[in-house]
């Protein structure tokens, strides 16, 4: 089964899951290629929901094109479910996210939501997190200090650049992204707390304190659902 077909299958499974919600509620939607499948497949059922909150400008544009009513996070007090992908996920449901650069907004919406449904294909499942570079959103003026601190933690920080321009990648919030290579993250909850304490770090792409409640993973045999308790 090709990767796109796996993404479509898990996105369809997530649609089936969220349509179990009573009508008239809000839904959180993430960012990335699998989330895009989810948006497109859910579009015919948008009337079931009062509105959606989105983790990025890119997802918001796609949602509006598909006719969804997109709400600002400040307008929403009750968010039953957030659906998003992951760059890596371990057997405990801890994730690395933020490969697309939207980690801060993803983290805010994940914290607001009662349930986090992670959708991905089996290639994202790992025993230990860290092979995928861990993204940090940072305040630009803190970059040299954060870089030194990350080196002391045993990681190699690389500032994310845009194409051939040699300019730093700018997030939707005006921050920079530091991708940390070379970490073997055996203690994700502790590392998340440790990195969050570094002055100038806006957020870290470790979703361990708030992990996935339900993983829908696409593999050769179809979609497998794995529940995790917080």
Predicted regions and their residues:
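Active-site catalytic microenvironments in core metabolic enzymes, especially phosphate/sugar-handling
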Residues: 1-26, 31-78, 210
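Conserved phosphate- and dinucleotide-binding cores of soluble alpha/beta proteins
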Residues: 2-9, 57-230
